[in-house]
């Protein structure tokens, strides 16, 4: 399973995507869309609020950190697609509130 959580631990808000399955997910391509369906790459930092995202592999807990941005309504549609080492494609959509 892949899930996204909003966590506050004293260092600021963090949106964390974690792979808890036994499937390897080393090749992860994330695409996020705002509520108005405007897509933006994870490298884009033109929005007012940005949050770090941590991607953790379910097996060896390797982490990949990046930054995404959210809209002013504190809610956005998140869509991410990834492919594991066996070539299987996965996709998940979620509305994220923070």
Question: Model segments located where?
Answer:
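Amphipathic alpha-helical "stem/stalk" segments
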Residues: 1-98
């Amino acid at each position: 399973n892949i899930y996204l959580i909003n966590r506050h631990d004293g260092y600021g808000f963090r949106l964390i995507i974690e792979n808890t399955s036994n499937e390897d997910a080393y090749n992860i391509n994330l695409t996020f869309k705002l509520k108005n369906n405007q897509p933006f790459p994870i490298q884009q930092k033109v929005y007012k609020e940005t949050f770090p995202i941590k991607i953790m592999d379910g097996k060896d807990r390797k982490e990949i950190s990046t930054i995404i941005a959210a809209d002013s309504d504190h809610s956005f549609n998140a869509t991410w697609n990834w492919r594991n080492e066996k070539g299987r494609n996965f996709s998940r959509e979620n509305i994220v509130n923070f």
